């Protein structure tokens, strides 16, 4: 049946499960399914019960915990009050992402499968288990599992004679460029006086805005959608002097572990959670976390803007595009925010010289390459045949977005796609504060 609805859900910690879910969504759309891609925390067990076909991608966090975007859904699915026949209408396919170097390999996916079966759901095909220890990473198990998934779904929902499934993605046979999830509206350029506003706070505001828009794209209604709430989050971040940065591991050890100490004695007590403490007491308690905001070198940001032909002082507004997943209640996001400078968006949001991008980055980049040689190489990296070469070039050699863009100098993606396919800068936490 053409237009059969397919719900794709993910529980992600670092973004890998979300990346796989987005890939399944794109491939499903090309196969004439009506696809919605949502975080597991965007739905309830009762909503899942109303679905007939679901694909779920789940990673394992820490020592077997549920991933970040599943931590609300998982306890609700474990409620003893749920009837055992709740999911009798659901046929599901489940893929787990894990690392066999850990004792609880893919335990979150295995637990979820067990609970779904307890609630009378049925499996479309056997569970797939991706392993980061494989030479090609989790893609080595994912690619054949996806072939089985589409075969099973097509047997269940055959197409009419007038429609056909696309050929498998391979080198030299890339699908058309997918529409972007984000809509970027240009609204002029900022004045020289405006560009001298506090760069740190403006870049932090940009990261808050993009995070909320991405949540809206994935069906999660942000807890607060106004610019004033974003500004309150920005104002909760402070600068503190660094007075100790000592390496704990020996210089010959492969891992650089450091002891970092910050002086927070001058921070306003009202800005810290435990503000009831006396002035003579430390304004924190055992177990608190300090989240550190990364900053990128100005020269790196300027070089990236030059390479991508972006205007640093252009002002833009961000919103989910018409192609993004809508809210479960059918309403579009009403997130409102002041315009953001492109430079602040790049510097505050995109990890241009840190993390290596995902596989989809190379597929998108291939559509913008002006050189046949570069396009062929990018298509090869994005194909199943090129996954081991991609693993070596991208992950093991730790290529950054900036380095890849200079390697493929004729490919210049639009800002909408850069915001979608680049790895986002993220706060990192220091425990044992």
What is the meaning of each model-derived region?
Residues 1-433:
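FNR-like FAD-binding dehydrogenase module
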């Amino acid at each position: 049946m053409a237009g059969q609805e397919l719900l794709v859900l993910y529980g992600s910690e670092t973004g890998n499960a979300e990346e796989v879910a987005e890939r399944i969504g794109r491939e499903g759309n090309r196969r004439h399914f009506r696809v919605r891609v949502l975080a597991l925390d965007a739905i309830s067990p009762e909503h899942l019960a109303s679905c007939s076909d679901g694909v779920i991608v789940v990673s394992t966090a820490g020592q077997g915990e549920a991933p970040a975007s599943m931590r609300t859904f998982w306890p609700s699915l474990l409620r003893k009050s749920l009837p055992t026949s709740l999911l009798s209408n659901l046929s599901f396919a489940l893929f787990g992402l894990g690392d066999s170097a850990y004792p609880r390999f893919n335990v979150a996916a295995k637990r979820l499968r067990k609970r779904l079966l307890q609630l009378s759901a049925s499996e479309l095909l056997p569970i797939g288990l991706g392993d980061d220890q494989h030479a090609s990473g989790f893609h080595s198990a994912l690619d054949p599992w996806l072939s089985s998934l589409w075969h099973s779904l097509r047997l269940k929902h055959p197409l009419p004679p007038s429609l056909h499934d696309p050929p498998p993605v391979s080198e030299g046979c890339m699908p058309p460029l997918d529409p972007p999830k984000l809509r970027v509206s240009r609204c002029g350029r900022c004045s020289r006086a405006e560009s001298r506003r506090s760069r740190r706070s403006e870049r932090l505001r940009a990261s808050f805005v993009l995070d909320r828009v991405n949540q809206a794209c994935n069906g999660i209604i942000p807890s607060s959608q106004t610019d004033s709430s974003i500004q309150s989050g920005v104002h909760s971040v402070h600068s503190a002097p660094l007075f100790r940065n000592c390496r704990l591991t020996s210089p010959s050890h492969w891992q650089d572990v450091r002891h970092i100490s910050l002086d927070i004695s001058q921070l306003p007590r009202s800005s810290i959670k435990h503000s009831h403490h006396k002035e003579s007491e430390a304004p924190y308690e055992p177990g608190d976390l300090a989240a550190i905001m990364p900053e990128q070198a100005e020269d790196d940001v300027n070089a990236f803007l030059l390479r991508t032909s972006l205007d640093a002082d252009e002002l833009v507004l961000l919103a989910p595009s018409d192609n993004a997943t809508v809210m479960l209640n059918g309403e579009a996001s009403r997130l409102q925010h002041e315009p953001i400078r492109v430079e602040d968006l790049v510097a505050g949001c995109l990890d241009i010289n840190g993390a290596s991008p995902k596989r989809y980055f190379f597929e998108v980049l291939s559509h913008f390459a002006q050189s046949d040689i570069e396009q062929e190489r990018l298509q090869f990296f994005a194909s199943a045949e090129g996954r081991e070469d991609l693993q070596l070039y991208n992950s093991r050699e730790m290529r950054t977005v900036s380095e890849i863009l200079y390697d493929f100098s004729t490919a210049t993606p639009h800002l909408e796609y850069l915001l979608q396919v680049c790895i986002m800068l993220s706060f990192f936490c220091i425990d044992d504060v």
